[in-house]
Amino acid sequence: MVRVRADLQCFNPRDYQVELLDKATKKNTIVQLGTGSGKTFIAVLLLKEYGVQLFAPLDQGGKRAFFVVEKVNLVEQQAIHIEVHTSFKVGQVHGQTSSGLWDSKEQCDQFMKRHHVVVITAQCLLDLIRHAYLKIEDMCVLIFDECHHALGSQHPYRSIMVDYKLLKKDKPVPRVLGLTASLIKAKVAPEKLMEQLKKLESAMDSVIETASDLVSLSKYGAKPYEVVIICKDFEIGCLGIPNFDTVIEIFDETVAFVNTTTEFHPDLDLDPRRPIKDSLKTTRAVFRQLGPWAAWRTAQVWEKELGKIIKSQVLPDKTLRFLNMAKTSMITIKRLLEPEMKKIKSIEALRPYVPQRVIRLFEILETFNPEFQKERMKLEKAEHLSAIIFVDQRYIAYSLLLMMRHIKSWEPKFKFVNPDYVVGASGRNLASSDSQGLHKRQTEVLRRFHRNEINCLIATSVLEEGVDVKQCNLVIKFDRPLDMRSYVQSKGRARRAGSRYVITVEEKDTAACDSDLKDFQQIEKILLSRHRTVNNPIEDDSDRFEEFDVDSQMEPYVVEKTGATLKMSTAIALINRYCSKLPSDIFTRLVPHNQIIPIEENGVTKYCAELLLPINSPIKHAIVLKNPMPNKKTAQMAVALEACRQLHLEGELDDNLLPKGRESIAKLLEHIDEEPDEYAPGIAAKVGSSKRKQLYDKKIARALNESFVEADKECFIYAFELERFREAELTLNPKRRKFEDPFNYEYCFGFLSAKEIPKIPPFPVFLRQGNMKVRLIVAPKKTTVTAAQLQEIQLFHNYLFTQVLQMCKTGNLEFDGTSNAPLNTLIVPLNKRKDDMSYTINMKYVSEVVANMENMPRIPKDEVRRQYKFNAEDYKDAIVMPWYRNLEQPVFYYVAEILPEWRPSSKFPDTHFETFNEYFIKKYKLEIYDQNQSLLDVDFTSTRLNLLQPRIQNQPRRSRTVSNSSTSNIPQASASDSKESNTSVPHSSQRQILVPELMDIHPISATLWNVIAALPSIFYRVNQLLLTDELRETILVKAFGKEKTKLDDNVEWNSLAYATEYEEKQTIIVKKIQQLRDLNQKSIEDQERETRENDKIDDGEELFNIGVWDPEEAVRIGVEISSRDDRMDGEDQDTVGLTQGLHDGNISDEDDELPFVMHDYTARLTSNRNGIGAWSGSESIVPSGWGDWDGPEPDNSPMPFQILGGPGGLNVQALMADVGRVFDPSTASSSLSQTVQESTVSPPKQLTKEEEQFKKLQNDLLKQAKERLEALEMSEDMEKPRRLEDTVNLEDYGDDQENQEDENTPTNFPKTIDEEIEELSIGARKKQEIDDNAAKTDVLERENCEVLPVAINEKSRSFSFEKESKAINGRLIRQRSEEYVSHIDSDIGLGVSPCLLLTALTTSNAADGMSLERFETIGDSFLKFATTDYLYHTLLDQHEGKLSFARSKEVSNCNLYRLGKKLGIPQLIVANKFDAHDSWLPPCYIPTCDFKAPNTDDAEEKDNEIERILDGQVIEEKPENKTGWDIGGDVSKSTTDGIETITFPKQARVGNDDISPLPYNLLTQQHISDKSIADAVEALIGVHLLTLGPNPTLKVMNWMGLKVIQKDQKSDVPSPLLRFIDTPTNPNASLNFLNNLWQQFQFTQLEEKIGYRFKERAYLVQAFTHASYINNRVTGCYQRLEFLGDAVLDYMITRYLFEDSRQYSPGVLTDLRSALVNNTIFASLAVKFEFQKHFIAMCPGLYHMIEKFVKLCSERNFDTNFNAEMYMVTTEEEIDEGQEEDIEVPKAMGDIFESVAGAIYLDSGRNLDTTWQVIFHMMRGTIELCCANPPRSPIRELMEFEQSKVRFSKMERILESGKVRVTVEVVNNMRFTGMGRNYRIAKATAAKRALKYLHQIEQQRRQSPSLTTV
């Protein structure tokens, strides 16, 4: 028979606040919670739950809620609080309110009509009731603050409740909620307490509920075995320590001296006493508590520490003397103790000098020694130690650790203990570096404890609370627990079954300890008896529970396929596990919601159960148990089993019956997540990443490949018509040469083709004569050529490429005139006739050239030269070559001008030679014969063959142009002659003079020469455009099923244009963010100048790669990347922040010098020295109402007083004065509240009592304060608990006069669980009935949705999402008339222009005039949007976690890469710069070697693996075979404990990324990264979207293989209203419920704010429902809508930015997009439109978060200054475990904003234009602000902030959640981590964190400039 442990058999409990709220709605309840821990939450949410009745009009049955407070000053405070969180109108009433309430009942009624909730003082409410202005039955909720006052028989609370009870007998009465601080004082006798609690319950007619975190711990925590060990007292004086008296005397005298000295003026001197007092205090405390050995050790530490302070900086003499005095005291104490202590080398020797508690401690530990367990305890399997030892003081923790380490080294039997310690930060100042270090150390130690690397943790109370520690089996309370909290918390840490909880106590404390523990246990019982979760019981009071075998009650569930079996006894645990795996934020624990239903069968009570899973689970309906069970527990188990069955059928549990958790998803994400751009060796590049590159063949267009011309067959003539559209830039033409427009030439070049070639767009090339537009024009008539002509043409063609263009120099090409050449068109010179635009081949010219085809230059014989006569005509438009120079590399010159006045005898422009004659004779031994010839002024012909880009003058020319020039270049002629000279490029404005006689004239004229130089660029571009035209045709046919793909004769494509083509354009594309800012500030002229300069500097590449940190870059710039990494590693973290400071060094056991900072005093000495300003912690002690003084103006209301921790000094006088000021009644009114002046004027009969109370309170507090201060002096390092429970002593409030009527009312404390279940369900039913009957406004069915006038705005209509973009030019135009042919949605015309397709295929690496980046940005966001839309509508019941995963898979780079590869995209991509000499194959040439490099072996295999993963198959883990390459890489990647870590080593990268690891054939192959292919796919999507509009694009995406919904596919959108709760008797239950929610959360009001009226209201309700709100079963939660809205917003905003007339460059576009599409912005907008008031949630953590955030936003006045901290604030999706308190932005708020966008999109029938109108209305200000002052990405900003010293050092992936954590190191010793869904987010978060911290430091520096001078 299976015995079931009861505690494993309950569903995970809800948050206690939610539990309380649930009870409070169903029955009258008194909630007792400390300040801040959620009373506010419960009150406000209770009011919201009654919203339906409150918002109903008063005359139609609406009710009112009253919030009754004790003191006037609380009225406003509570009212403000309620207003922040709800849409209620809140009225305030107290004695001084002047509203005419009292004048007449009408006035009062008017007031009630206007306000839903009234916050009122008790006396006023009583008066209103007594005067019959108000009736209790018209209220629906009555909340009493500080309800313990009701014990006073004369108190108005009591009087109101008396009336209430009388009414109760025959009228409906409101729900009562009493709020009070904790009623359990540790020192109250339990019996007495019980009696008082009952009294209070009776007075308030309510039940006290004791749920709290503490009680939950008692209830659900483990029950360890408790032991008290009594030890001998430790009296330090009786140990006979040598020199004992001297030591004590030194302590006393030094302390007295330090305390009484008046040497230091508080404002003028550097006061060193803090560290000195600390050193004395701690050493003395250790001496007294742990004995001389520990004190000896501590003294050493301090000696060193003080020494460090003395050396650390220049200090004034007086200060130094003081420090030295202290150091001497320490040395003396050390020396006095040393002789004896040094000898100790074993635990026996130590025994006499330590308390017995320590020895006992070691005895307990010894029982965990594996040998001891085997031999003495006869255990088979040793139990591993996992212990926590709690001590009160930080120093004791440290000293114990030292002792343990030494004993471990002395005694082999303790070798198994691995101790460490953990303490909290004292100061609350989290920005200080030491508490950061401390926090890091704490997390690190706890992580090692989790992994069992440490098995014994010594801790202060910091671990009792909050910090999650794994289960341990031994908890030792070294100092006995002094209060209930400490007892329960520390006990709750022993969670493992069978663990022990040991308290060590000395004999003198035994009695006290004993009675305390008894009380604690009694009180625990009382508390538990009042915290019953009846629907999820732990205890079962039905009899017969133990008697039978649970599993026999119901058949187990078996999965046939795998044989997995689930029994009843394990079902609950599985459901708990499933719920915890559902997506939720960090504040929300999703738990199942169970209800037990008692049923009478033949007089026997049996039980059914009903289970609701969290609302984001696909199973939305209640799971009901059909057959009743004999008791409650089994009913729970049975319903859980049924739920598991349904979950398995839904596919939520896999066939092994395990939740399909995030682990498997994380595993997959690992393959597809984008990877770090940091360098880490040995990590194989992932498929789809930019690191993984492969080789692909280059492709030649079909038309050019098949154009081989045969003799005597007809062929087409194609002419290259060049037309100049712009003169050459003056900078490029410094000598002001005149050029003719080639359009006017009588001849041009063209080529012959056997086939017709498709029309392609004209395109620009940039020649010396200016910028040309090239058109490919077909001659009207075909032609034929004879075999002889063909041969001549081939020779001519070959001549052009070899002789003129010098292409075959390297011998890698050979001419092939057959059809084998990949590109086989022949180039011919053409004559053109202007009149009819006809072209003919100029054979005469061909023959001439071919006839003169010798190797140029020809060297004339001497006699020929003597005959030479100069003829100017020969040199016009000629190309000349000097023949007396290097003939290997001939140099060609254009003759620019003939200089008739220059002769060879003219003066030579260089001092070394007199004349030209002399120069040539001396230099070349050449005599010039014709002395009458004119000289020539010439220009270089450039060998730059890439003319695709505008010419940029200040690029140094290739040296091959002028390898060894000896032209007489003035003034450097001689200099450039020597071979070594590097100045061979003459400055372009200097003239170059040549002598005609020494020249050879080239047969080809200069004008044609220019055109020939353009041929490679022209052919290269024509090929590209033809290829993209083929792609266009493929898409038309395959994606759109079009027959016709050819262009008609009368239309042509618009020409290919670059962004940089015109200067006008240059102002349009905004490149750098800085520029964008200037554009908005400076005048436009400056702007143009600046942009122009920018454009000249960059070659199109540099400005785009913004923000990628590459260590190599740094090295290049000369930054030293240092390798100091010694800050926080190893043992040196040991003493971090023990008091507060970091240090380096290592603790070794033998080393006597213990480096150990007790306080970072140096920081203290230089930091703020004004007493109070330095207090950092602020824990208020006085309960005021219930806020932690969250009064109206916290800044100027004085804090009650603060417990001081942290670095500040203690200014006792100031403190006492403060306490006096706050608690002196005569001044209290003015200080406690600025709003109410006379707080004590209230009906007179209470005055005296209140004053007495105040007086008493005041004296108590003063007394407390004094005690505290003394205690503080005594032991400042006692750790404080995180928060102090407020408690109320009920005795103070009761009085002896018992009211008579109380006797008659029996206490209503239900006796059994069944009775309570009954009571709760009746309460719930009643409320439901009233809700349903309350009048509803605005619940009519709506015909259609509409955008309200407030949101209508012309600017949002500047473009339409349904149509193509206005910003795109590349359409069809009517031939020559330049008029656009437009095409509408259904008619896609002829597809996308080849030039746009080409842009979409050109990477930025190609350094061309265009790149795909802008298209890629828009394509990326449209792809995300389309995929999301598809997934949302196809996976209808999947929760957001699975949707997100499916989306990441679909849009991942590896998926796009795989699709792109299938479509052959890589062969079309332009990935490298055009280099005519190396990587271009000219027409009619073939490479001389046919070598082709293969791809790496595993490339194929990896692609296939990814293919399998993306198809959703299971991945089998392959053992990776290590190659020699991987060995080095092992270190960088490791997986432990569910975290995979990749460390990026510090090293400069060697070599260049772009270089392939293997040689490959440049002519036929290209090397492209996977990511470029993915980018190109996105860019193609983008370009189709912008040219054709969205619907055709979806067809194209479908053709690509992406999953999208097509326009014409009708997708059934199920109604958002879920109808599970409808029943035959109540068919409209769900609609009614929706109406209730609609009214309760005031959604009509919200619609007005956002400017949109919903047709389907359920969408809006769903958009506001948080997963924690279990009551809404009619819509589901917002997670799916958020998933959709996220993509909708992203796409709309990106598209809007894209359409902006300022045409942002890709970098800016991306930055603006990430600045606008992020959680922080969305959350602030949500708060701006008060979404939080309509938020449907039950989640305390989130509630407090939102409250803080709303305050933050209103302080900033809702302005989104992107560069302010606001943009830096962290949202919860970015946070790391254990750092929850860092969050400032509640992600939920951003999520609602996104889900509202999703809701509008769906409600408007998926209409983006409508959605954009509404969203633009909300975001307009933000968007405009952002564009005017764009933020920089945090990564970039960090790089600039600390340029030299930033390094991203490692990345970890948490496998459970799939999140990524990235670490960044700044200035070597500061580390910040960031979390995120993927690497990119995490990296940005880490950068944000670092920046935030650096900004803080910066600010502190600015604020205290005077202090840095010390």
Swiss-Prot record:
Signal peptide: none annotated. SUPFAM superfamilies: dsRNA-binding domain-like (SSF54768), P-loop containing nucleoside triphosphate hydrolases (SSF52540), PAZ domain (SSF101690), RNase III domain-like (SSF69065). Residues 951-988, 1227-1248, 1272-1309 are annotated as: Disordered. Residues 571-667 form the Dicer dsRNA-binding fold domain. The record marks D1537, G1538 as: Cleavage. Pfam families: Dicer_dimer (PF03368), Dicer_dsRBD (PF20932), Dicer_PBD (PF20930), Dicer_platform (PF20931), Helicase_C (PF00271), PAZ (PF02170), ResIII (PF04851), Ribonuclease_3 (PF00636). Residues 1272-1286 have a biased composition (Basic and acidic residues). Mg(2+) binds at E1682, D1791, E1794. Its EC number is 3.1.26.-, 3.1.21.-. Changing D1537E: Loss of cleavage by ced-3. Loss of deoxyribonuclease (DNase) activity. Reduced number of cell corpses in embryos. It is an enzyme of class 3 (hydrolase). The avoidance behavior is transgenerationally inherited, and thus progeny display this same aversion despite never been exposed to this pathogenic bacteria. This is Endoribonuclease dcr-1. It comes from Caenorhabditis elegans.
